[in-house]
Structures are given as C-alpha cells and as structure tokens.
Amino acid sequence: MDAFKLLTRSTKFKTGPSSSSASLPSTGKAENPQLFRNSEAEKLLEEQKNGKKRKRGSAADEPEEREPNLDFFSSNKGSSKKVVKAEEAPSDEERGSGSEDEDEMDEVQRRTILNSHKIKVTDMRELEEIQPVQAQGEEEPKKKKKKRKQKEEPAQTLTKKEQKKARRLFPRPLVSFKELRTQYKISRRLAENITEQGFTVPTEVQLGTLPLLLGDRTIGQSKTEEPVEPDLLVVAPTGSGKTLSFLIPVINKIVRHHHGQQEERGIFAVVVAPTKELASQIVNEGRKLVSGTGVKITLMKKGMQVVEREDDDEDVLDEGSSESSESEDDEKTTEKKSKGKAPVTKSDILVTTPLQLVNALSANKTKPMATLPLVRNIVLDEADVLLDPLFREQTLDIWRACTHPELRASLWSATMGSSIEDLAKSTIKERKDASSLTKSYPLYRLVVGLKDSAIPNIQHKLVYAATEQGKLLGLRQLLHPAAAAASDIRLRPPFLIFTQTIPRAVALHSELRYDIPPEAGGSSRIAVLHSDLSDGQRSEIMKNFRKGEIWILVTTDLLARGIDFRGINGVVNYDIPNSAAVYVHRVGRTGRAGREGGVAVTYYTKEDIPYVKSIANVIDVSEKLRGTEGEKSVQKWLLDSLPDLSKKDKKELKKHGVRARQTNLKSVADDKQQRKTRISTKSGFERRMENKKKGAIAASRNRKLQGPSGAEPDSGDDGWGGIQE
C-alpha cells in the first residue's frame, strides 16, 4: 500500500495541464505577432522604444550611464533620485524633432535587427545603376582622372558574393507603430485609426516595408534630398500583415495629396486581388483605416463605371432613339440615358479582381481599353497568381492602363518565383523606357524568412491513407477523436478542408454533413464553398463561418490565398495541393499573426506518391526553421525514397491536378481509376439500386408528360365535338 496515497486520500490535487488549456489560434490574439526574434534584437528595439540613444563612438561611456539602475547597494533616497533622472531623460528626447531620431540607429544596429528578424532587403536594379548611387553617398577625396576607367571595370569583374553584398540594403526598421506619426509624419487621423485597431508591435513585413514606402532616408542618395518611394517586391509569410503594410502608405499618400490639391479627385490607387473574397476583405480592412481621413475605398462590382468615355453618351442616345417611337417625348430619352449609364465611381482607392476592371475599362471588350491617368499606386496582392498565365494578360492590361508617369508598383505574396520577379522587372523597365522621365526610381525586394516556405509556428502532419476510403476514415477520426497516444494530433473546430475540384468538395460535404450530432448543431455546422455558388451565397457562408455558426468549411483553392481567418485551428488537405506554393498558402490559413497551436494535416494515397516530395520538402524546411526537437513529421528515409518529379509533370500537376481525380476523364481505364477515387462509403450494390430507383422515377415522369400529347393524334377529328345547332 502506498503510504503517501493513503495520507492524502482526502486531498484533491490539480491534474497536469490538459489539452483543453493548450494554446490554440481560436483562443485569442498572440502577445507578439512576430515569427522571428531573438534577445539581442529585442534589447535593441526596447532601447529605441524607451528613447535611449546610443551615441556613436561613446560605447565606453555607456556603462556609466546605466550605473544608477544597476546600483543595488545604494540608499533608497539616492537611488530614487537617480532613477527619476534616468526616467526623465527619455521623455525629453521624445520631444525632439524627427531629424534627431534618424541618427539614433547606426548601420550595425540596423543590420542586427534586420538579420535577427530574417529580413533581407535587396536592390534589384542593374549594378551599373546601383554603384553610382553608392559613390555619391560616400564623401571621398578628389581622385585623379586616371582612376575613372578603373571604376567601370569592377562592375564586370565582381564575384557573385561581392555582387550580393553590393545589392544588400539595411534600412531603418520600424520600432513601434507610434513611430509612424513621430518619425514618418503620417496623418494624425490615420495614426489614431491604427491605434484603435490595437496594432502595437509591428510584424516582420511591417517592420521592414513601412519605412521604405513612407520615405526612409537611411538608404537614399543623401539625407538632404527628398526620399524616393521605390517599386517593391515583397515575399513574406502568410498571416504576417501584408494588407496593413500596403494600405497605410497608400492612404497616407492620398491624404497628403488631398491637402495639397483639393480640386483634383479620382482613382489614385488600384489594388488587384485574385478572388472576390480577398478583395472584399481588403476593403473591410481599408475602411477601418480610412475612417475620418476623407479617403474613400471601394470594392469593384459588376456594372460599375470607373472612367467617363466621350462615346458612351452617343451610344446611349442612339439606343434610346432607335427603341423609342416618334410620339415619345424627350423625357423618356433622358430616363433611358440615366438607366443605361451608371455614374462614374467617386473613389480614391479601387479594390478589384482582374476581369472586373478589364471589363469596365474595355466596356466588356467591345471598345479599346480606357486609361486611368490619375492612378499613382498599383498594388498586386498575391502577385504570383495575378502574373500566372491564368490572370497575366488581364493584370498586365490593368498595369498598362495606369499611365501616370510617377506610377509606383508593389507586388505582395507569400510565394514568388524567379519568373514572376523577372516579369515584374521587365514590365517596370518597359514603362521606364517608354516614358520621358529622366528620374530613376529604385526597385527593391524584401524577403522575410526563407523564401517560399511555410510558417514555422504551426504543426505539420503528413499521413499516408493508401486509398480514398482511408482518407475518409482518417478525416472521421479527426471529427470524432477516440482515446489516442499523446503524440497524435488533435484538431479542434473550426477548421478548413481543401479538395482538388468542385465536384469532390460537394461530394465530401454530402458525405460528412450528418457526422456532427444534432445536439451540437447537426448539418448546419458543415458547409461547402466554391466558385459555382452565387456571390450572395458565398458571402453568407463566409459571414456565418466568421461568426462561428459554421465549424467546418469544405472548399477548393478559392480560399487558399489571402483570406484572414484568425481563429482557424487547423487545415486539412484532403487532396494534396497542386504545388508546393499552393501548400504554403493553404496551411497559411491557420497560425495567423503569430498564433501558436495551428495544425496542418495532409492525406495522400498510392496515386499521390509521385507528387508528394515537394510538399514533404516544404514541411521539412518549416520544421528546421522552427527548430523543433523530437520526432519529425517527415523522416529522412521518406524524403530519400519519394521520387522526384520532372518539369513537365510539375507543369501538368499545377495546371490540372492529380490525374486520377480529374473530372474530364473519358477512357475506360480512367473511368476505373475514377471509381477508385470516388468520395463515398456506399457499396456498389447500394449505388446500383439507387440508380435504378432514380431511373424508374424519371421514366414515370416522362410517361406522364408524354401521355396527353400522345393521345391527341388518335382522338383527332373522330372524337365527339359537342351539340351542333
């Protein structure tokens, strides 16, 4: 008998921390939204927040300044006086001008903070354009004419390492959102709106991009010149605050323009997003920021007029005169004109999908593309999709329609291949060559973390299910977890389930809709969302999912990009993604803004084995970035055994998905394969009986419809025609 147990039998001990108390994305906002940080960088940032300036060349004096705070053996009176003096100093410095604050952080400090947060800023221009800028910034003594030839040679003889070093930039990072007002002089009302939204600590992408877009002087040609807004390519993890990063500079720029030129009004910025859901989300976030600033942000809708055409009036009048009779008066003609032509949108920022704006500018492709001469900023959110073959022509048409000579472009995504970067560079260069401006605008690229990698704050699980029935069984085990080992992953609602095609999403939804008991809400807790639904249905499902009325949402890649569900606990890839980039975006729906505890489960079958390696590599890199200890989700033997995919197969997979799950298969062999991948637990006999029943009902309905029509020829004139008088 255990004596301790006997003596403490009346005492209730608290059990260890249960899984319910574990940190989950749905439990609330993370204390620190930053993904990458260390103690040294946090110490430097804290010094900047508290106003403690580190003077150059005075490192020896620094311990003496900190002595009062470290003197633990002094008397109470003396120490209190010294502490008060130390606390009063920052308040005096905070009252100083912004020009003094610019000298606070030297290049070593900037480099330390940026490197610790894994922020890499690169100048994407040619070396011939970069080196003259660097030469002007340096104050050098007079040189002889003989050495001028030697200046041109290093541009060709530089090694790759030296070229990378020449391109690296270390701008001043944003310490806190308060600096937007004190350091960069943004609109007072805009700064208040940011504070009201609860933004205090900037994420990595905000820490790096906001100073660049708001006029950072630390990397310019000289501090006396006006800062130049660059063109920007940004690759940052999902959920890191990219929307806020591009909205704040655009709104501030428009506010300044309105103060300077009140009479000029029109569309000054265009934000392009690949889906309606993402465009609507950007507008909702933008409306919170523009409140009280006088800036208007609008979502592009069907039939909306964005430009005024001279030939539109003539067309409407011609239509009205041809349709109306001679007796109609002029009032009806004017009514037709007002009905036929919508008023031009009075908005400063237009958020749109590519096709909607192209149709508006080209009158549904019946007229030449109109121009947007006032647009000074074009933002491509999820730029890798917008410049993919599916949207490329539409996006480039919008880009070309923005004809203002000082147009600045910024491209944002969590994944951006080298081909997309090259296309962006070539487009910007074409515009520069076509314009008559001699002024050169820099092109920078900012990368946070490892490029094209998944966020490190979520747990990945790659599960082999062998067959379609195995995947369905594994998914039901997630919905109804039984007693399991501590190492097993538990996924709690709300979560998303991704499928390859719309028919598969519908089939999976119909299979799972009764898996949640009626006591918990039943079938109303599971919904399906895809592009075949109407706009009203899609917005209603999104609203209910955000409100928490829907717990499980089955969808396609429609929701894989940009949508911010902050309380999502996990993602289930029921069908493997078409590429590693799609995987990064899918799993990025959880773990938003630094939230811990998100789970990403990916099921794969025998048919998926040739395509899994790219996903396994992304998971492996993410776990290395996280620095997890213990058992990994992807073992080394699995990485070594999975086959590599050829470029042709990768292209085919990206375009059509796994062949066995395609809906347009017609051959006998493909039909057999499709039967294997059917999402259903019904046996073949049950399906045959259901089909027979459906066929009998359809035949009976047809006989009823054909009965009266078939009797007419027989009855004809032989029937009784009534009493004739």
Curated annotation (Swiss-Prot):
Annotated protein name in UniProt: ATP-dependent RNA helicase rok1
Enzyme class: hydrolase
Gene: rok1
Entry keyword rRNA processing: yes
Stated family: Belongs to the DEAD box helicase family. DDX52/ROK1 subfamily.
Bias (Low complexity) ranges: 14-30
Motif (Q motif): 179-207
Keyword annotations: ATP-binding, Helicase, Hydrolase, Nucleotide-binding, Nucleus, Ribosome biogenesis, RNA-binding, rRNA processing
Domain Helicase C-terminal: 474-642
Assigned EC number: 3.6.4.13
GO biological process, alphabetically ordered: maturation of SSU-rRNA
Organism field: Aspergillus oryzae (strain ATCC 42149 / RIB 40)
Positions that bind ATP: A236, P237, T238, G239, S240, G241, K242, T243
Function according to Swiss-Prot or TrEMBL: ATP-dependent RNA helicase involved in 40S ribosomal subunit biogenesis. Required for the processing and cleavage of 35S pre-rRNA at sites A0, A1, and A2, leading to mature 18S rRNA.
Catalysis: reaction(s): ATP + H2O = ADP + phosphate + H(+)
An example Gene Ontology molecular-function term: RNA binding
Disulfide bond positions: none
Pfam families associated with the record: DEAD (PF00270), Helicase_C (PF00271)
Motif DEAD box per record, residues: 381-384
Ranges of residues in domain Helicase ATP-binding: 223-434
